Amino acid sequence: MAQGTIRFWAAAKAAAGVAEEPYEAETLAAALEAVRTRHPGDLVRVLQRSSFLIDGDPVGTRGHETVRLAEGGTVEVLPPFAGG
């Protein structure tokens, strides 16, 4: 099982109450399920609207269960940003 870091930005950071936390998961889907378990409530809603970067690469429309996580990797949680 891969271990790495999940970073929360903007509304995701506010909802999680932390800027980052470790993950231990093989896929993005498994990592996000663990996050939902640790942070029920507002963060669950924020995750539904968020986009994700894996080691700097956008996940886009790929199924989260198909996105493999690397040892020492980073998942960035990017909620929609307001403004312009």
Residue ranges and their predicted role:
Residues 1-83:
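Ubiquitin-like/PB1-type beta-grasp interaction modules and other compact soluble beta-rich domains
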